[in-house]
């Protein structure tokens, strides 16, 4: 009888995790999604546990989603405001780690502009660490919620063609999704301007690069649109928003190139009229609102499973 995958202590990224290690997160999240819809989520799974949300970058969806997830499981949730904390007064990340460690929190959710910051914290604190997005590196819970959304519609997470379009080069969401989707044996197409499409990504598995958006969408089961991350861009990578939409915007004509009923996804926030047309974002094929809903369920599952790793045997 095969051994069951062990419960991880941290969730720092998707890279290196097998499909067998990822499925338990998705299965538990599925059950939490059903319970949340019936308003009967277990309120005591994290009772007596403390979750600290430490966000060095602005966030609405992810921080709120983690806060709801912790509270629905009965945890004490603390949102640390970096703008008014000692961090803003010059405290280093390692000093912050020492302070948080002294507070004896159980789970630490971290978003940081620097790639690798959550991994560094995980080596310095006793708490379980969840990466809520680090630089351009990874955003593992976003990939999990995207995977759950896809699985709910197709009944499987294998053998699909997924087109990820837009600012791939600066996207931690794209990287985590590439690792997850290829782990399950899917075909991934990356589409965008050559300036935003690093060639190294072709070496991440069953991945194809396209500078022609139309070709990338032909026969796709899922189309995932990404926003232009201007805060991480240098000058001149994209001539103008109008020109970008002309060549790489997801509109009705382009969506028709994908398979009938193909899912339309976006991690948010959306720039309507830049990477996606409003009538596509609001269409029956769009599952963008469902992604947000699944985000809470996935984060409940992540906090729950990581907390079990801290329980004595």
From Swiss-Prot:
Gene Ontology BP term (one): amino acid metabolic process
Keywords, alphabetical: Pyrimidine biosynthesis, Transferase
Binding site for carbamoyl phosphate: 61-62, 111, 139, 142, 268-269
Annotated metabolic or biological route of this protein: Pyrimidine metabolism; UMP biosynthesis via de novo pathway; (S)-dihydroorotate from bicarbonate: step 2/3
InterPro entries (UniProt xref): Asp/Orn_carbamoyltranf_P-bd, Asp/Orn_carbamoylTrfase, Asp/Orn_carbamoylTrfase_sf, Asp_carbamoyltransf, Asp_carbamoyltransf_Asp/Orn-bd
DNA-binding listed as a keyword: no
One annotated Gene Ontology cellular component of this protein: cytosol
Enzyme class: transferase
Gene3D superfamilies the record matches: Aspartate/ornithine carbamoyltransferase
Catalysed reactions, semicolon-separated: carbamoyl phosphate + L-aspartate = N-carbamoyl-L-aspartate + phosphate + H(+)
Enzyme Commission numbers on file: 2.1.3.2
Pfam entry (one): OTCace
Functional description taken from the UniProt entry: Catalyzes the condensation of carbamoyl phosphate and aspartate to form carbamoyl aspartate and inorganic phosphate, the committed step in the de novo pyrimidine nucleotide biosynthesis pathway.
Protein's name according to its UniProt entry: Aspartate carbamoyltransferase catalytic subunit
Organism: Gluconobacter oxydans (strain 621H)
Lineage, uppermost ranks: Bacteria, Pseudomonadati, Pseudomonadota, Alphaproteobacteria, Acetobacterales
